[in-house]
Amino acid sequence: MALEQALQAARQGELDVLRSLHAAGLLGPSLRDPLDALPVHHAARAGKLHCLRFLVEEAALPAAARARNGATPAHDASATGHLACLQWLLSQGGCRVQDKDNSGATVLHLAARFGHPEVVNWLLHHGGGDPTAATDMGALPIHYAAAKGDFPSLRLLVEHYPEGVNAQTKNGATPLYLACQEGHLEVTQYLVQECGADPHARAHDGMTPLHAAAQMGHSPVIVWLVSCTDVSLSEQDKDGATAMHFAASRGHTKVLSWLLLHGGEISADLWGGTPLHDAAENGELECCQILVVNGAELDVRDRDGYTAADLSDFNGHSHCTRYLRTVENLSVEHRVLSRDPSAELEAKQPDSGMSSPNTTVSVQPLNFDLSSPTSTLSNYDSCSSSHSSIKGQHPPCGLSSARAADIQSYMDMLNPELGLPRGTIGKPTPPPPPPSFPPPPPPPGTQLPPPPPGYPAPKPPVGPQAADIYMQTKNKLRHVETEALKKELSSCDGHDGLRRQDSSRKPRAFSKQPSTGDYYRQLGRCPGETLAARPGMAHSEEVRARQPARAGCPRLGPAARGSLEGPSAPPQAALLPGNHVPNGCAADPKASRELPPPPPPPPPPLPEAASSPPPAPPLPLESAGPGCGQRRSSSSTGSTKSFNMMSPTGDNSELLAEIKAGKSLKPTPQSKGLTTVFSGIGQPAFQPDSPLPSVSPALSPVRSPTPPAAGFQPLLNGSLVPVPPTTPAPGVQLDVEALIPTHDEQGRPIPEWKRQVMVRKMQLKMQEEEEQRRKEEEEEARLASMPAWRRDLLRKKLEEEREQKRKEEERQKQEELRREKEQSEKLRTLGYDESKLAPWQRQVILKKGDIAKY
C-alpha cells in the first residue's frame, strides 16, 4: 500500500502525501517497484522537480540509485525529456553525465533515442555530453537519432562529431542503414547529400541500406536511393540475396513491382533460392503471382533440391501451392492471367494496362505514385493476348480438351471468391421453367402462400460441390489461419518452426530474442499494471545483433515495432523501438472538440402518424461523461503503444508510438475520428413536402409521401428531425444552416460561431453518410451475383473488419475524452470559467500553461 502511494504521489507531484509517508517512516531505499525503480525514478521521469528534491534532500533517498537495468533517475529524466530534473540531478543530485546503464547507454544516448532535441542540445553545449560514447554494441547517439528520425538531434550530433556519419555498430550498421531501415527519407537524403554518408557501406552480413529498405518495404527510400545514388539493384549480401529477395520474402508487393519495373533481375542466391522460393516459403501469394508473370522459372531447385512449390507445400501454404502447381502445367503466355484472388475484396487502383516490365507491346506510360497505395498487381492484370481476362472467357479453340481443362481450372483457381463454380464459366444459366398455372394474386396485407405441392423441391448439393465449397472456404480463410499460426509460434522456435529441418538455406525472416528488461518501455506503467502486457524490446537488448534461426553470421533486423507479430513479423531492432512523439504538450484538440454543445431546444411536434420514437442515439462526444481513458494495445493494427510516459498532472499525458505499416503495403481502413453532434442513418436533410425537387428552408411536420426505409430518426441537439430521403432528388441544394436552431432550450440565442461549427459538423456528417451509402450499394451489387454461402462468408469478413474499426474509433474517442477532461481540470485549476471561453482562448491559456511548466 505504501509503495503504491509513494509511487503515485511521486508521479503526480503530491508533496503532502510524500511528507506524510516520510513522517510515518515509510520512505526508504527498499521501497522499489517491480523493476527496482525508486520513487526518485518516478519523480524524475514525471518531471516533478519539487518532489524529486524532497525525496533526495529530506527523505534521504539516493539520487544516483540504479534500477534493475542500471538506469539512474538522470536516465529517466533524459528519456522522458524533462530537462529541469536532468539539470538538477547532474548538478546537485550526484548523477554524472557519463553514467551508463547495463547496456552502456548514457543520458545522451537516451535523449537521442527518444527524440528530445532540447535535451540533446543542452547536453552537447553545457552538460558535457560525449557524442563519441558508444554502447556495449558500439552504437553512438547519432545511430539512435538516425533510427528515430529525429532530424534536429541528428544535425546537432553531426556538428559535434562529423566522423560519426559512417560509424558502424558491432554488427556493422551505419546511421544511414538505420535511417533506410526505418523509412526516414529526409534523414536519408541529409546523410547522403550533406554529410557524405556512404550508401554502399555494408553491415557485417553484407546487407546495404538498399537491402534494409527493401526488407521493410519503404518504397520512397528505395526510389530515392536508386534514382539519386549509384547503388545497384543487383547488389547481393553475403548469402547472395538481392533487394528483390528481401521484398519477396516479406510480402512487399509494391516494392517488388517497382524493382521489376526498373530493371531488377530474378536471380538465385548462394543457396540456390530465387525470390520466388522466398515468397512461396512465406506464403506470399501476391509476390508469387508477380514473379510468375515476370518470367520466374517454376522448376528451379535450390541446393536442397526443392522448388518454390515444394517449399510452399512444406510450410502449409496451400493457396500458394495450388497456384504454383497449376501454373506449372501452363505455357508462359498463359501465365499472364495471374491475378490476386483478394484484389476484388480491397480498394485497388484501376489497371494501368501494362502486363509486365518486359512486355514488348505498346503500352501507356505508368504513372507510379508513391503517395497512394496502388494495386500490387495493377501492372500485370492485362496483356495483349486475347485470353487475358479470367472472367467469361472460353478456352482457345485450337487447344486439346486436356489443355483447355487445365486453363479453365487455372482461371477458376485464380479467383475462387468471385468466380463461378467450375464448369459454369462461359455458360449462361438457364432460367427456371415457368409454372404451368398463373399464381393467384395474394390478398392485400398478407404474405405469399407457400408453393403448391407439385412445385419441384430444390436439390441438395452433391459431394463434389460440397468439397469445392470446403476448399474455397478454406482458401478464403488463409490469411486468418496464418495470423493464428504466427501467434502460436511467437513463443516457440521462431520462423523455422515450419521450415524443413534438413535445409541449409538461410530464411529471410528473423526470430526475436527474448527480452529480459522492460525498464525504459515501462516508464509510464502504473504499479499494478501487468508487465507482460507490453511486449517489445528493452533497451538493453535492442543493440544486439539478431541471429537467424539457422544462420551462423549475424543479420541486421529493422527497428522494433512495439509488438511481436510472430515469426514473419518485422524483425526486432538493431537499435531501438518504434517512433515516439516527444514528451510534452500534445497536439491541441480540434476546434470542434473544444466547445460544449448548446443546450438542446424543446422538441418540435412529431409528424402525424409517426411511429413510437426510436431509442436515443449515443450522446455526442463533447457531452459524454468522463471516462477512464485506459490505454490498451490495438490488435487490429498489429502494433502496441511503446514507451508510454504518463504525465501525472493530467496535461496531455501519453506518448503514443507511431503506428507503422506491417509486413504489407496494402491499404488499411483508417477511422476518420470525426466528432459530430448529429447522429442518424440518413443524410441530415429535411423531409420535403412533396416528391418534387424543391426544398423548404423550414422543418415540416407533414409526413413524407415516401417514408424512409430506416427505422431511426436523426437527433439534432436533442430534437427529433424528420428523416430525410436516402438520396435527395438531383439538383436539390440542401440548406444545412436552416436546420441549426438559433436559440437554445432556455430561449437564449446561440452564438454565431457555435452555429457555424454545428453547420460544418453536419456537412461532414452528410458527406460521410453519402459515402457510406454509396459503398454499401456497391457492396450489395457485388454480393448479389454470388452464391448465398459465399456471400455469407464475405459478409462475415466485412462485419469483422467493421467491428475492428468500431473498436479503434471507440478507443480514440476515449482518448480524446480523457484529454479534454484533463484540459478542463487545468482550466478550473487556473481559475477560468470554461463556459465563457472561446476555443482560441482555451488554446492560448493551455499553451501558456504548458510553456510556464518548463
From Swiss-Prot:
Keyword Repeat: yes
GO terms for MF: actin filament binding; SH3 domain binding
Region (Disordered): 338-400, 415-474, 487-713, 765-788, 800-832
Ranges of compositional bias, category Polar residues: 352-377, 643-652, 667-678
Sequence ranges of Basic and acidic residues compositional bias: 338-349, 487-505
InterPro entries: Ankyrin_rpt, Ankyrin_rpt-contain_sf, Espin/Espin-like, WH2_dom
Compositional bias segments (type: Pro residues): 428-463, 595-620
GO CC terms: brush border; cytoplasm; filamentous actin; microvillus; stereocilium; stereocilium tip
Domain notes for this protein: The WH2-domain binds actin monomer and mediates actin bundle assembly.
Subunit structure: Monomer. Binds F-actin in a Ca(2+)-resistant fashion. Interacts (via N-terminus) with BAIAP2 (via SH3-domain). Interacts with PFN2. Interacts with MYO3A (via C-terminus). Interacts with MYO3B (via C-terminus).
Role summary: Multifunctional actin-bundling protein. Plays a major role in regulating the organization, dimension, dynamics and signaling capacities of the actin filament-rich microvilli in the mechanosensory and chemosensory cells. Required for the assembly and stabilization of the stereociliary parallel actin bundles. Plays a crucial role in the formation and maintenance of inner ear hair cell stereocilia. Involved in the elongation of actin in stereocilia. In extrastriolar hair cells, required for targeting MYO3B to stereocilia tips, and for regulation of stereocilia diameter and staircase formation.
UniProt-recorded name of the protein: Espin
Species: Homo sapiens
